[in-house]
Amino acid sequence: MENLCDKCSSVIYSKEYHQCLANSTTRNFIVCNSTTINYDSLTMKQLCELANGGNKQVQKIILDRIQFFSYGSVPHRYIEFKKWEYFMDKIPHNQNYVRLYLCWIYYNCMEIDGSIIAHIKNLAKMCNIDAQTNYGLVNEYGIGVKKNIKKAIKWYKLSCYKENLFGLLFLGSLYERGYGVSCDKHMAFNLYEKATKHNYPAVKRQLAFMYRTGSGTTKNINKSHELYREAANQGYPLAQYALALQCKYGHGCIKNYKEAETWLIRSYNNGCLYATYSLARLYIETKSPLRNYSRAFELMQEAASENYLLAINYLAKIYKNGIGVNKNISRAIYWYYKAGNSTKITELLEINNSVIINTLDCNIFTCLDSIENEILFDIQLYILKYKYGDKCDYNLQLYQQLETIVFECIKLRNALDKSSALTTCLKPITKEYRDELSKFTIDTDVFVKHYYFNKQTYMTFGKANVKLSDDIIFFLSKKPYINIVNKLICLNKTNIDTVKDIKSINSKLQKYANLFVRYIEETVNIRNTMFQIKFSFIFR
């Protein structure tokens, strides 16, 4: 759990330093002596928050760590480079920083200043090998220019003639993937090997992967483990993550959960999203003393909140099975929806067919009106009888309770007719709907719940404040009137005619409940136009 300040409620990132927003004497205080700040204890996310807030010292610390990271290891999701004065002052002149900036622009789908591209191109033509690599990157991903893989290969090859680190890495990646060139794993392996003289951790990690899978070279698990460990010790998050998995499963080493935890924590602290998920899994799947359900739940929530699909599915499983939390089928359904996993939803609800909203013209409404009047007439007749005739106060109280229940049902139905509630609208949502659903949260926008009635599974899906149809089904399925009817029969069991009348009322009540459920199933529609627009993707 994050440690919060008692005064300003903001996160305390280190014991040595905290910029309290509630204390005017320290509000604008910036520590100049870095030795008083334990930056090593901060995660990459926390460091980025400080850097985004204008702390130049932290900006420099982060850049020193990531300037030789590959695209997949840089925590772009936490970084706001345009707020980093220290960084932007060196664009477009420092080509290492330019490469990071290009990747960040691509990750965030942002526009880039054309003058930066022009500057890179001019330097590339002047045989600046770092600029040649960057201009290849510009053309490969279409950053500020039209995507052109042939041009990208040309510039990568030019930089490779002088064995530029990133030129070798990027060209090797193209051969490994077969993108723009014929797939040649052996060529990729040779290019990565050439780059190893730079002692660059990302290259070691690529070679480790190829040794592990036997791609482009002879399979060698021990060599793979050795390279992963070297890159991990250099602080490379993806290598730390891979090494942790090898320690967890005993690939190339003796199985060691404690060491796996150590490397996953380091990788997580360096901003690796995969490590967040895997660390949560480790805390769930191992035995004591490592097992920690509460921490696992926090980590899985964190990974799911960043739309990591494996974490979203696993979080649904946590809610489904009550792993470290109370079982919550509604939230399980919600997270399976976010993952686009309709199969799991169907399994969860124990039904074979999905049902969508259905509006039918029928006479059930009239039937409900009619049976309501019949039931109320019978009940009120008995109320009068016991009130002015027989002196059985307890009978009178029970009939009055029964009358209240029927009036409550009528009230609920009237409210339902005026609402935008809906029911039986479960429809498998495929991956194409996931982005739409991710805009909403279970707490603020969506009400999702399942229930059983007469051996059938139902589901409501609607606005959080509109759950009337579910309330009604729950109310009817509990049949609160049954206990009252049973008590009335027990009190009057010696009077055969009275018991017969009570059973007649009970029969009508059960028929009424079943008709009410059918009414909800067949006629409840989405009547709120704004609601229809907002959630229209559900009913495509």
Swiss-Prot record:
Start and stop residues of the Sel1-like repeats: 129-164, 165-200, 201-236, 237-272, 273-308, 309-344
Domain of life: Viruses
Keywords from the named record: Repeat
Cited InterPro entries: Sel1-like, Sel1_AlgK, TPR-like_helical_dom_sf
Pfam families: Sel1 (PF08238)
Protein name: Putative sel1-like repeat-containing protein R815
